[in-house]
């Protein structure tokens, strides 16, 4: 399920924008020029998988603006998407060296 979500069109663009700053729905929609239903679907998937957090900001109106922010898990997903993009640009004879370590952050 995670790979299916990350492979969706515009997911990387959303994560990149949220990596630079928290944004509300209409900011994302205007910046990406996406239909609201498409953006809502992408954001719902990202929130459900823990890549993005959703919170309601203060507002004098009945409905406040909903802000979205990238989570640490979302930042790691963005790094993986960047790595995949780099892998796609490799030429014959080139290789990627990856150093990684899995740590238990609850210890």
Swiss-Prot record:
UniProt keyword list: DNA-binding, Transcription, Transcription regulation
GO molecular function: DNA binding
Top-level taxonomic group: Archaea
Transmembrane spans: none
InterPro entries per the UniProt record, alphabetical: ArnR1-like_HTH (IPR038723), ArsR-like_HTH (IPR011991), WH-like_DNA-bd_sf (IPR036388), WH_DNA-bd_sf (IPR036390)
A Pfam short name: HTH_45
Protein name (database record): Uncharacterized HTH-type transcriptional regulator MJ0361
Organism in which the protein naturally occurs: Methanocaldococcus jannaschii (strain ATCC 43067 / DSM 2661 / JAL-1 / JCM 10045 / NBRC 100440) (Methanococcus jannaschii)
């Amino acid at each position: 399920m995670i790979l299916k979500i990350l492979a969706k069109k515009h997911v990387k663009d959303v994560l990149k924008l949220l990596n630079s700053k928290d944004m509300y729905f209409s900011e994302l929609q205007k910046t990406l020029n996406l239909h609201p239903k498409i953006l809502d679907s992408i954001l719902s998937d990202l929130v459900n998988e823990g890549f993005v957090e959703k919170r309601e900001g203060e507002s004098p109106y009945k409905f406040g603006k909903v802000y979205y922010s990238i989570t640490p898990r979302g930042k790691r997903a963005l790094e993986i998407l960047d790595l995949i993009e780099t892998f796609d640009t490799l030429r014959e004879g080139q290789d990627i060296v990856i150093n990684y370590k899995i740590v238990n952050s609850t210890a």
